[in-house]
Swiss-Prot record:
Xref: Pfam families: RepL
Organism: Bacillus subtilis
Gene3D superfamilies: Winged helix-like DNA-binding domain superfamily/Winged helix DNA-binding domain
Residues that span the membrane, as ranges: none
Keywords: DNA replication, Plasmid
Single GO BP term: plasmid maintenance
Keyword Plastid on entry: no
GO molecular function (one): DNA binding
Lineage, top ranks: Bacteria, Bacillati, Bacillota, Bacilli, Bacillales
Name of the protein this chain belongs to: Replication and maintenance protein
Alphabetized InterPro entries for the sequence: HTH_CRP (IPR012318), Plasmid_replication_RepL (IPR008813), WH-like_DNA-bd_sf (IPR036388), WH_DNA-bd_sf (IPR036390)
Amino acid sequence: MKERYGTVYKGSQRLIDEESGEVIEVDKLYRKQTSGNFVKAYIVQLISMLDMIGGKKLKIVNYILDNVHLSNNTMIATTREIAKATGTSLQTVITTLKILEEGNIIKRKTGVLMLNPELLMRGDDQKQKYLLLEFGNFEQEANEID
């Protein structure tokens, strides 16, 4: 993983070369580490989500977490496909997805769901801002379709 640094200017300073006695003016720059490209799991939100769900519903949540595309936090699957893949009933999938929607954990359109980037995402702060905008617009787009 490549770390990223932001350069911060802290002014200038005069130094004296011990050998020559020459006065040298230098700029003081510091590097501040910023978020790199990694997967963030926000534990508080993850735990609160798991508290809302139990049993077979947890199987569905794990399936979503395992199959979401971290490039855009989406998963393309119908409720029937999720039910078949997890060995749960269609009604359990529908109920679980409704709970996740009401908890602002996912947003859905026909055949596609998007996971809230405050819960899980891969990328830096800029990517999170972008995904949060997409997450906000996801529901709006879904409402325009309906």
